[in-house]
Each structure stands twice: as structure tokens, then as C-alpha cells.
Amino acid sequence: MAKVDKIRKAVLFGDSDANIAFRDLCSLLISLGFSERIKGGHHIFSHRSVDEIINLQPKGNKAKPYQVKQVRNIITRYRLGVNDE
């Protein structure tokens, strides 16, 4: 769980959006309760309490910076990962 916490902090602080590994971002979403389905190169994440769908595609082995920002906005908007869920 320590690695997921480290990834979560990196995503939330937003200092290194271009340096987040794609697989780490996927792992973070799964640990927050998202379900993943894959269609071609698209990894599509949905969550029962989130109205939005997250659609991610890797850029090499990194996540695309604008998609990291989208994930950050959803985590903060829906207060995901907060102890009082």
C-alpha cells in the first residue's frame, strides 16, 4: 500500500504529471475502487459513485500528462481515497 500512497501523492501534488508510469496510474485507480476494462489500447475505468468514465492510453510506458490531470481532478472532486468514504 505504500507504493500506492506514493503514487497518489505524486498525482495529487501535480509536480510530475509527465513522469507518472502508466501502470502505476492504473494501479492507483484500481486501489480506489475503479473497475478496469480494456478495449484495444484504451483502458477504461468506471466507479459506482463517480459519474464520469476515465479513458486512459499509454504514451510509451508513461501516462499522458493531461490524463493524469483528469485523474487528479476526479480524485479531488469526488474525495476518493479519503478515510470517510
What does each model-identified segment do?
Residues 2-39, 48-85:
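Basic nucleic-acid-binding interfaces
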